[in-house]
A protein has these predicted regions:
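Intein-associated homing endonuclease modules of the LAGLIDADG/DOD-type, together
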Residues: 1-214
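Short, intrinsically disordered, charge-balanced linker/junction segments flanking boundaries
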Residues: 215-219
Length: 219
């Protein structure tokens, strides 16, 4: 994609015999790009285009899955949050599926764990929870990843999935002007990278070390 001209007052650049203006899209192969002089290379910036897939039916709302992947219990459908909007969303979604959102224990950062249950006690009712059954269906119990049905789905579905991941496990880095998601599960990190790039966004992965202070000790 063309950026501002190198020479002051220039309104266009000629590339491979064609005239281009600022913000024009230049469709050029790598071989031809490498033959360009440096000043023309400096005028061109990478332009990413998202992938389009047909919509596929899934048994768990993409946002709900994204939120669980980011901050849910890997063994069942429990989530931890203090965000009012998130609590309202899951409460509404649970009711629409004949389930209940119940409040559990409070964490060290005033975060509260919420359980999505059938509201009935007994082992036989364990398998009546459609949320939990969906996790089993997509082989997600103790195996967090983005199922193929969600990775190769409509743009709207993938955006909702990414929104859930960001709301649960992401934050805005002002210094780099980017959204960062810290994820220790490597297969899931790779899936998130694919998701971001499939939507036409720039995504990178790098290793980092996270720590916190607890009772004067670094953990």
């Amino acid at each position: 994609k063309m950026t501002k001209s190198r020479q002051k007052g220039d309104k266009h650049q000629t590339i491979m015999g064609k005239r281009y203006y600022k913000n024009d899209i230049v469709d050029i192969c790598i071989r031809d790009y490498l033959t360009l002089p440096k000043y023309l290379k400096d005028c061109l910036k990478g332009y990413k285009v998202g992938l389009e897939f047909e919509e596929k039916e899934v048994s768990l709302d993409p946002y709900a899955l994204g939120y669980w992947l980011g901050d849910g219990d890997k063994t069942t459908f429990h989530i931890t949050t203090i965000e009012k909007e998130v609590i309202e969303y899951f409460n509404k979604y649970a009711k629409e599926n004949g389930l209940q959102l119940t409040r559990g224990k409070e964490g060290t950062k005033n975060e509260i764990t919420y359980h999505i249950t059938t509201g009935m006690i007994g082992g036989s009712n364990y398998n009546r929870n459609p949320f939990l059954n969906s996790l089993k269906k997509y082989n997600l119990i103790r195996n967090k990843h983005i199922p193929e049905q969600y990775k190769i789905n409509s743009r709207q579905s993938r955006l909702k999935l990414l929104a859930g991941l960001i709301d649960s496990d992401g934050y805005y880095n002002r210094q780099s002007n980017a959204i960062e998601i810290t994820q220790k599960v490597k297969p899931l990190a790779k899936d998130i990278l694919f998701l971001v790039r499939s939507l036409g966004m720039r995504g990178t992965v790098k290793e980092c070390e996270k720590s916190c202070m607890y009772k004067g000790e670094k953990k």
